[in-house]
Amino acid sequence: MAYSLWNDQIVEEGSITISPEDRGYQFGDGIYEVIKVYNGHMFTAQEHIDRFYASAEKIRLVIPYTKDVLHKLLHDLIEKNNLNTGHVYFQITRGTTSRNHIFPDASVPAVLTGNVKTGERSIENFEKGVKATLVEDVRWLRCDIKSLNLLGAVLAKQEASEKGCYEAILHRGDIITECSSANVYGIKDGKLYTHPANNYILNGITRQVILKCAAEINLPVIEEPMTKGDLLTMDEIIVSSVSSEVTPVIDVDGQQIGAGVPGEWTRKLQKAFEAKLPISINA
């Protein structure tokens, strides 16, 4: 039996009823997070929870629980489901009220939900690399907020899937931003390039870990926008997210990247990232 988070309770998944007038359902008026679980333990849990509260503040949504309470609820949800390896997803909406674009009265309670998903690490992708395609970035201008409004990303990801690609690498005009569900990096002449963390991208928690890994292996980081031309001439390309970890891209729209296999710096980053997993798990 599967269990879900329903506000401050862990309940049977099938017992939850969402109102058709929930603002998340009608407006996408809410935020979410996804945390990777290894061996029953959340990885970088505090960073994800901190970002959850930061996103809530940006959209003026009050979370009616402390960070410590939320952390305990997520821990209990994982334990109740006996989750070993996978993800825990949680979201909060601005609550249920008659449909109106204007915020509801402060007395309307927010609605917190969460669930878990079992899933092993994508070792084959890490080892062999994946294909990607370039797609115009048509999302809104507050990509730094982990909003429930994901239609632009959904359309891009679908386009990539239909082309037989793992990811859609997004660009606004000629400038590379990120992917439909990941951050993107290029490595050229021993330097790591990635878009700066501003409103055009989500400052991924995995991204933050990777930048620390780069410093540890003496790989200089340049946070500057890349052009499409820059990207296609990189020696190596990687994408990162909670599920992707450090995934090499070996082909973009049929153009081989580097030698067409995961590169030396990618392997070093993967090794440095992997080394952090037990550190966080035991923290």
Curated annotation (Swiss-Prot):
The modification N6-(pyridoxal phosphate)lysine is found at K146. It comes from the Bacteria. The active site is at K146 (proton acceptor). The keyword Transferase applies. It catalyses: D-alanine + 2-oxoglutarate = D-glutamate + pyruvate. Pyridoxal 5'-phosphate binds at R51, E178. This is D-alanine aminotransferase. It comes from Lysinibacillus sphaericus (Bacillus sphaericus). The gene is dat.
